[in-house]
Swiss-Prot record:
Its main location: host cell. Residues 86-104, 320-338 have a biased composition (Polar residues). This is Mucin-like protein Glc1.8a. Involved in suppression of the insect cellular immune response. Inhibits host hemocyte adhesion and phagocytosis. Residues 489-515 are cytoplasmic. Belongs to the polydnaviridae Glc1.8 protein family. Residues 21-467 are extracellular. Keywords: Glycoprotein, Host membrane, Host-virus interaction, Inhibition of host innate immune response by virus, Membrane, Signal, Transmembrane, Transmembrane helix, Viral immunoevasion.
Amino acid sequence: MSQITLIILILAIGFSCTKSHPINSTRDGEDSGTDLKNLLTEPANTTYATNSTLTRKELNSTIQPERNDEGSAIRKIMASKKDENITGQSEINTSAKSQPINSTRDGEDSGTDLKNLLTEPANTTYATNSTLTRKELNSSIPPERNDEGSAIRKIMASKKDEIITGQSEINTIAKSQPINSTRDGEDSGTDLKNLLTEPANTTYATNSTLTRKELNSSIPPERNDEGSAIRKIMASKKDEIITGQSEINTIAKSQPINSTRDGEDSGTDLKNLLTELANTTYLTNSTLTRKELNSIIQPERNDESSAIRKIMASKKDENVTGQSEINTSAKSQPINSTRDGEDSGTDLKNLLTDPANTTYATNSTLTRKELNSTIQPERNDETSAIRKIMASRKDENVTGQSEFNISTNSNLNTTTHHEDAVVSPTEKVYVPNNASSAELNVSSTIQPKEADATTSSANDIKKPAFPYCIILITFQIVTVGMIIYLVFRTMRKPCQSERAIPLNTFGFGNNSSHE
């Protein structure tokens, strides 16, 4: 009996050692490290350090700008830079290298800086910090609950003779001409500066804090969707024209929202609208739950009037037309996934031009459900939200439908140890994704890597794990062998001395001789 108890105890200890690595995830299956990067091109020696955490309600609040459209808060935004015109409506025009709003407790705006309206040299450093309470944002952002009188009368600003008068929800435009507006809301003189070229060695350090209710109060000025709040966004740079509607026009190299547990965001930074040079390093980390991703890509629950009609863009002879919730192109890491027909290493490469010597260090972890949620923006598919995405580079055309247009010069190459293999774009070398579906989806996920720009490449080489599994299997084989030995020893035939005592009919020894 004691031998059997000892065997059971040994087996229990052995099998308790077979603990698998848990999935590297946050509290509710959030994904850490999702990074959509570098929409077009990027300047040299620029460093970004980002971190974001958004709850589902926070993301829902950022994508619902049009609840009541009886009176649109912003009628037309017309801007010209030489031959450039931008007309349309927008709740939030957040463009490139802007100083966030520094506000006091009573909601008054202190220190708004529309910086470097024409030219900005290299080696420029921005250090900003803003903290707005919900009441402050409520007081500053929804001036037009009753749209009979427009909340934005005049926003006139000039450099040298700069004057800013009027009301504005959030006019966060940096390295650009401030909005000069007339009574009917038409905007004249907006200068979106440096759409092509940006000097190198520019460092940005920003920090902002917004609660979920504050973001909610800043974005939904239009509760009724009878008339869309964004009619036309037309922009031309020489021969370039962009027209269409968009809830969120997030262009190129923006800092994702850094949020704390209560939904406050710190560090929102939209940078570098078009071009950047080489030698750019990004250190990113983000955490989004499946429901949060689902809320990002579903702005059109009621598809009777599509929120995004046309997005037409031309760069010399290049045209992009169609509808898209998220047009994330150029130098972004594609999602490597397995299991349900998910996309493993898709590389839509080099839509425009990709400079050399660009290094990306990313860590992403997406579950199957999270990936499924990012590619299902249209619950009601009667009218598809994305009709055509046509892009041409000289004679190249790409047509079709896509939720994500992810273009890059490097793949997110995942090894069996779940490390991101950084591939130099100049060498044009791609490492295939060899991780099995069981490794990616069952036992473990891609482990986020502590990215450090100063760490040598030698630190990226993982030492092989100690073969605990081999030791455990050997121990179990020995245990099973010992069990078999004990069983056969118990069941062996009795020896000759034991046969000398005959048994009677009832199984007892015959003791008559002793009597």
